[in-house]
Amino acid sequence: MIRVLSLNLQHGLPGAGAGDGSASTGSLARADISDPATARAVMRATAEQIAELAPDIVALQEVDLGQARSGRLAQAAFLAEELGMPTCRFCASYAGPVVGLRRRPLRTALSSPTDDVLGLLRAAVGSGPIGYGNALLSRFPVSGWHVKRLGHGASSVEKRGERAWDPRSYHVSTASQRIMVAATLEVPEGAGGPIRQLSVASTHLATRESMAARQLAAAWGALAGLPGPHLLVGDYNLSAEQVEVLGLGRTVGEGFTFPAAGPKRRIDHVLTDLWPTGPDGLPLTDEAAAAGGSPLLRAVDWGTTSFIISDHVGTWVDLEPVG
């Protein structure tokens, strides 16, 4: 069995789950994570909650790297170390500060000053890489990393003032760049039955439905070209019905994930390969599906979990090979 967890970190901001009054998390409600020590305490508590679920794979979204608002912490690397997961990759949607000069990274890992067009200048004044994006963590070894840029939607202009001739009456919103980070993992004997490889990706799609649908199709198309079976995990900003109508893959798991204070929608998903059908259009039996040659996964358990951080709850799925 393989357990995968998806969690939108919301840059580690304490959320509804931090206000439950428990001894372990109550003191972190409304914590100022711009303080490095506090940021580390919040991330350490988050790691403890993740560890309780014992996932094999963790897909993260809205991850900060070196941002002032989150204590300059490399959040993905910190969580990987706390969890003892040797496989970790941060993938930047953009380099630069959250507020300020955002830019397209030369290389999305942002692991070296040369990965950012301004990286050498930052290094010269003693500053490290800075960015924002997604991440993948796993206890399984990795044989290859893959990145797919998914583009961004159109900018929008909102009129906020009364004077049509005054530029200050308008607010311009630019859509965020979206990205997918994928890994082909080597599955140890006994963890995935007969499956020895698995390709899994983490992504965070646009808030506009039409753009999110296009990005999802592009992400799945890129992932499907890697060794299967396949798992596309993350914050889609789409409902299960909106995902299923696209006919790209098969959603597994259920449970509302947003907003964390009182979840009413499921917008965080785990997508895997479509189940094959026979000439009558009906799904094949397990035996016939397994004999088709393409490895398949099915969900055997699932759930959602509230964390001390984020405006999302985490969603997890237990998967096993078919046949």
What are these regions, as identified by a protein language model?
Residues 1-131, 198, 213, 322-323:
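N-terminal, active-site-proximal structural segment of metallo-dependent hydrolase catalytic domains
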Residues 9-12, 64-65, 94-96, 140-143, ...:
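Short, solvent-exposed loop/turn segments at secondary-structure junctions
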Residues 3-9, 45-70, 137, 182-185, ...:
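Active-site beta-strand/loop signature of hydrolases that rely on acidic residues for catalysis
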Residues 142-147, 184-185, 209-231, 236-323:
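Metal-dependent phosphoester-hydrolase catalytic domains
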Residues 87-94, 145-151, 302-305:
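Conserved S-adenosyl-L-methionine
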Residues 25-30, 96-129, 156-172, 239-244, ...:
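Alpha-helical membrane-targeting segments
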Residues 29-36, 63-67, 150-172, 202-209:
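Surface-exposed cleft-lining segments at the edges of enzyme active sites
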